[in-house]
Each structure stands twice: as C-alpha cells, then as structure tokens.
C-alpha cells in the first residue's frame, strides 16, 4: 500500500504575511521597522476603500464628484490624491526614490484629511535607510492583503493586530509597552462591560483597549454608536500607531491634540468617563519633580502620591476621571497591593471609600515586555444596590460597598508562543461569570467562596490584614506552598539582608584598619 503523504497544515494568512515581512527587516531595529510595515498596511487599506468608493461614485452617476473630498468623507472614507494611492506606490516600487515617494504620500494624506492629523509617520521611510529593493519586496508582500475580500471579516484589523503583537514580542523586555496582550484586554472588557457611554484610556498605547471594547459591544449585539472614545499617549510614535489603529477600524476617537504626558499635560481635563480601561507603565519612577503637582486636584481627599513610583498617581488620576457610576479596570504591578507609607494611606482611603471592587492576581509571563507579577484592579464609583440595563438585560446589583472580591488566576492560563501565557475564551467567561454572580442578586444562582480561586472579603477582614490587597491573604489555599505570606517573607529577607550588610560593613572597617596600621592605607 502506498505511503500516505501527511498534508502540511496551512499557516494562517497573517502568520505567512508576518514571516515574509520579517525576512525583509535586515538590520533595521524591530522598534523602527514596525512603523514601516504598519504604515504600509494602513496605506493599502485606505487606498482600497478609496478605490471602492470612487468606483461606487462612477457607477451611481456621480462621476463629477470623484475628486470631491466630501463625497468620500460622508461615508468615512479618506480622500487620496493620485500620488498618495497604493496603485501609485506600487507602480513606482522599483524606483530608487520610493522611500521619499511613500513619505510624500503619507504627508499628503494627513494634509488632505484633518482627522488624520498627527497620525502618520513623518519622513520615516527616508530616514531609516531600508534599501529600495527590500522596500519594493515589502510592498509586494503587503499587496497580498485583500483588505476588502470579505465585508463580514475584519481582515486588515486582524493583520494589524497580529503584527502589533508580534512586534511587541520581538522587541521584548523593556520595550513593546505599546501593546497589552489581547486576552487581558478581553478579560477587562468582559468584567466592566463597556456597552454605552464614554470610554477612556489615559495611557492608550496603540489603542488596543478601544478596539477590544468595540469588539465586545459587537459580540454582545450592542451598538458601537452608543460609545465615545477618549485616550492619551505620551510617545509620539505610539500615538500615531493608535490613530492608525482606530482609523482602520472606523472608530472615531479623541486622543488629544498631541502626544503628551498624562500627569503634566492632561488632554481631557474635564472628562468624566463611564468606563476606564488601562495598562499604565509599571512602577514608573521620577514621574514628577518633588515640587510638582503637589496640590493637584486629582489627589483631593488623598495623600500626594510619592515621586518614587507612579502607581498610585495613576489610580487617583483614573478615580478623578470616573463619572458617578463609572467603572475602571486596570493593570498594576503587585507592589501596589501592599506598599507602605503614603501608598498605604492612599490604599486605605480607597478601601474605606468603598471604591475597590475586585483584585485579580494574574499569571506571570502574560506580558511580552516583562516577567513582573501583576494584578487586575476593578474600581467602581457606585457599589450601591441598583439596577442597570445591559444589552436589553436588566441586572439587579446588590450593595457591595463593604466588600472586595479577591480572585487568583495564576494557574488558569494556557501556553502561548512557547514562553508566554494567555487566557482561553472559556476561562475569561468563567471569571466574568463569577464576578457578575458576586455583584448581583440572583435567586437561582448564588456566589460562593472557592478555595484557591476566589474570596469575598469585607472591610473588617482587610483592616485585620493592615489594608493589604494581596489576594493570597484572603483566598484559602489547600496547597500550603501557595499560601505564602509575601509580606512576611519579604520582611524576613529584608531583615536578614540588612544584618548581612551591617556585618560586611564591619568587616570592611576592620580590614581597612589593619592595612592602615601596617602603613598601607587603602583609599576608597
């Protein structure tokens, strides 16, 4: 019998594209190359939609309007002058000055379409020095993306998102902060349910929180017209990525007039958001000078956050932006759960004010940029008993002002890209179900504490733990190895290490004296 040939599994479309594009990177840094690739994907997409609209105008008898900007803008299509179209770039791909032609095209598109102001790379292609032959080959790769092949499938969005994640992985530790892993964003969306109102991200990176919010609404049969998007981003290049990302999805967002520091140049001072989704920089140091922002309105009723770490500055900034029924879901390093001094005083006040709704410990290695342990915080301005209408379903929320839900998801992730962890759709659904059951009054379904998974603590429980929000202090663990008191162990290590340093200092002092007495004084 003839040996059966094993059929090779076909790679997903976006993976094949990535492989082809990455081979052409050469010596260009990944952090720079992403702007080249993503800009070309964006240019291909808006050119395809432009050509489709142009054809529609001709076919419907509006040929005389084919060069009128309003004829495109009315359908959220960007108007492109001839030298800015993909067809022009493709025709000139083999020219030595193709980099300059692409820069000119992007610059012209910005000038022609006000909503894209500040969105596109400025003279990026000319500056990076990618050879004309490699740039031509990359144009051929991007040309394989049929952005309009299936009107029911977000092909270009899928490719853009895939490339963002791959670039974040490629840049690795210390970089790639522009991207929050998709499964984390999905979890936040499922917990805070941003169906209707203003959504805000004070450190929006490439805009992933907004994209997943829209996907959440669409998957739950809601209307994206019911939300408005607000964001801010400090890094200019990432700000451009976000504006392109939103434009590709047809999301109208206000990301501020410029890329700017959220603390010192808030682009949305008067904003009151219904939902906040954020992944602030972890343990950001020197975020303000010692004499800056001391009496800022955002800290009203709280201590001024320390200059050494911005974690609590981010928390208070977000609290100040919430509407009276606003909810925030954000990621912080685990250090914020138990910090002492000023941080502890702010945390105590947040708990006493009934703002902290849930603390969820996440697995390590979920982020492409760091191995640091992190937690998801849910902060809610209104934990009182009330009814809300979501997607046509009435939810009766019970009073939770005196409670905080702790959850531990450290063992609930699954392997991803060999060395990373992500949440499956099933796990996200289970966690959301637990959280919403805890929030609500349901006659047929009641919340229960589950060992090694979840525990509902009251303010008295938390006060007994000296206002620590470390989940393992509350959740019961059957495996005692998991039930390690982090604070106690770290304080013990700190004490031991302090003793060792004192012993070393004494030994050094004695050794220096010996050499001095011998007439060979050592200068340090």
Stretches found by the model and what they are:
Residues 16, 23, 32-45, 239, ...:
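Conserved Class I SAM-dependent methyltransferase catalytic core
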């Amino acid at each position: 019998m003839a040996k059966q040939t094993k059929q090779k599994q076909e790679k997903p479309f976006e993976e094949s594209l990535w492989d082809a594009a990455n081979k052409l990177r050469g010596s260009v840094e990944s952090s720079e190359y992403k702007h080249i690739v993503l800009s070309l994907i964006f240019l291909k997409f808006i050119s395809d939609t432009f050509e489709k609209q142009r054809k529609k105008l001709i076919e419907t008898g509006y040929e005389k309007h084919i060069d009128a900007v309003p004829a495109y803008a009315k359908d959220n299509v960007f108007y492109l002058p001839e030298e800015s179209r993909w067809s022009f770039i493709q025709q000139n791909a083999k020219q030595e000055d193709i980099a300059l032609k692409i820069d000119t095209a992007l610059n012209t598109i910005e000038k022609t379409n006000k909503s894209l102001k500040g969105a596109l790379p400025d003279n990026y292609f000319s500056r990076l020095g990618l050879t004309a032959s490699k740039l031509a080959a990359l144009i051929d790769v991007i040309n394989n993306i049929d952005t309009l092949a299936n009107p029911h499938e977000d092909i270009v969005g899928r490719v853009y998102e895939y490339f963002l994640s791959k670039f974040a992985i490629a840049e690795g530790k210390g970089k790639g902060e522009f991207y929050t892993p998709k499964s984390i964003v999905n979890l936040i969306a499922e917990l805070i349910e941003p169906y209707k109102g203003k959504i805000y991200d004070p450190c929006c990176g490439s805009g992933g929180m907004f994209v997943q919010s829209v996907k959440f609404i669409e998957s739950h049969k809601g209307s994206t017209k019911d939300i408005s998007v607000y964001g801010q981003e400090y890094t200019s290049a990432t700000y451009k990525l976000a504006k392109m990302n939103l434009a590709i999805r047809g999301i109208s967002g206000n990301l501020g007039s410029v890329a700017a520091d959220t603390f010192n140049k808030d682009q949305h001072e008067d904003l009151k958001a219904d939902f906040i989704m954020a992944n602030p920089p972890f343990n950001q140091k020197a975020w303000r000078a010692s004499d800056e922002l001391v009496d800022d309105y955002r800290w009203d009723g709280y201590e001024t956050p320390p200059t050494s770490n911005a974690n609590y500055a981010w928390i208070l900034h977000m609290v100040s932006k919430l509407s009276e029924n606003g909810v925030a879901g954000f990621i912080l390093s685990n250090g914020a759960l138990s910090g002492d001094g000023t941080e502890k005083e702010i945390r105590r006040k947040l708990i006493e004010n009934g703002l902290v709704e849930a603390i969820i410990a996440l697995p390590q290695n979920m982020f492409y940029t760091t191995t640091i342990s992190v937690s998801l915080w849910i902060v809610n301005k209104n934990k009182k008993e009330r009814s809300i209408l979501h997607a046509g379903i009435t939810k009766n929320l019970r009073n939770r002002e005196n409670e905080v839900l702790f959850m531990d998801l450290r063992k609930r992730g699954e392997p991803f890209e060999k060395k990373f962890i992500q949440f499956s759709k099933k796990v996200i659904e289970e966690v959301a179900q637990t959280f919403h059951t805890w929030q609500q009054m349901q006659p047929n379904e009641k919340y229960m504490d589950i060992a090694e998974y979840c525990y509902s603590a009251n303010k008295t429980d938390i006060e007994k733990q000296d206002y620590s929000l470390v989940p393992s202090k509350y959740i019961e663990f059957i495996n005692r190895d998991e039930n390690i008191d982090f604070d106690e162990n770290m304080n013990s290590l700190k004490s031991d290490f302090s003793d060792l340093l004192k012993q070393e200092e004494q030994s050094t002092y004695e050794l220096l004296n010996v050499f001095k007495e011998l007439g060979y004084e050592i200068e340090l």
